[in-house]
C-alpha cells in the first residue's frame, strides 16, 4: 500500500493506504485484497472461469462483463411502444471502466464469444501499446463464462474478489505496480 506497509509504494496514487496483504497459509503464499478501492489483479494462464460482474485487465483497459437484462418491449398502458434504437442480440455486454469511475464504451456481444485485442477482433484498442493483436477471448455458453489469454505478451489480469493462492512465477498487479512472485 501507500502508508505503513512492509511493501510500500508511497508515490502510487492508485494504491489504497493498506491495499493488499501477502501471507502464508498451509505453506502456500496467498494475496488478499484488504478492501482496496482499485483492486488486486492476478495474471491468468490459459482459460479461467469468469463470474458475471468480474473486472479484468487487458493492456491498460479495465473491462467488466455484465449480463444483459431481459426487457419487456411491450406497449405502455395506453398502447404506445417506446421508440429507440433497435436492440442487438446477445446475452452479454462488455463495459470499459475509466479512471475516476466513469463508464467508457459499452459493447453488446452479438454471439457467444468475444475477442479482445489491438486489431481484427470484436473489441479493438488500436492505440493501447500493451495489448497484443489477439489478446484475450471470452466465451459464454448460457450458464458459464470463461476468459482465455491468447498468449499475449503482457498478460490478462483478473481482479481477485478476496484471496488468491500464488505460485512461483505468478504476476500480481495493483495500482501501477506489477509484482512477480519469487518463492525461494
What are these regions (language model features)?
Residues 1-52, 58-59, 107-176:
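Forkhead-associated
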Residues 47, 55, 72-76:
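Short amphipathic alpha-helical linker/capping segments at the junctions of internal repeats
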Residues 61-130, 139-143, 177-184:
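Regulatory inter-domain linker segments that are low-complexity and enriched
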Amino acid at each position: 500500500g501507500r502508508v505503513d506497509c512492509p511493501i510500500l509504494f508511497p508515490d502510487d496514487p492508485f494504491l489504497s493506504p493498506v491495499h493488499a496483504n501477502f501471507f502464508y497459509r498451509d505453506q502456500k503464499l496467498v494475496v488478499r485484497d484488504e478492501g482496496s478501492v482499485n483492486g488486486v489483479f492476478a495474471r491468468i494462464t490459459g482459460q479461467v472461469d469468469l463470474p458475471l460482474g468480474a473486472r479484468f485487465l487487458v493492456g491498460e483497459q479495465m473491462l467488466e462483463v455484465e449480463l444483459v437484462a431481459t426487457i419487456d418491449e411491450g406497449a405502455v398502458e395506453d398502447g404506445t411502444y417506446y421508440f429507440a434504437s433497435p436492440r442487438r442480440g446477445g446475452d452479454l455486454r462488455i463495459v470499459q471502466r475509466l479512471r475516476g469511475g466513469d463508464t467508457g464504451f459499452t459493447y453488446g456481444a452479438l454471439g457467444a464469444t468475444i475477442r479482445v485485442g489491438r486489431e481484427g477482433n470484436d473489441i479493438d484498442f488500436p492505440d493501447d501499446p500493451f495489448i497484443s493483436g489477439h489478446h484475450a477471448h471470452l466465451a459464454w455458453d448460457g450458464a458459464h463464462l470463461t476468459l482465455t489469454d491468447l498468449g499475449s505478451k503482457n498478460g490478462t489480469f483478473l481482479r481477485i474478489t478476496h484471496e488468491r493462492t500464488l505460485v512461483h512465477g505468478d504476476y500480481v498487479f495493483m495500482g501501477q505496480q506489477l509484482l512477480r512472485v519469487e518463492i525461494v
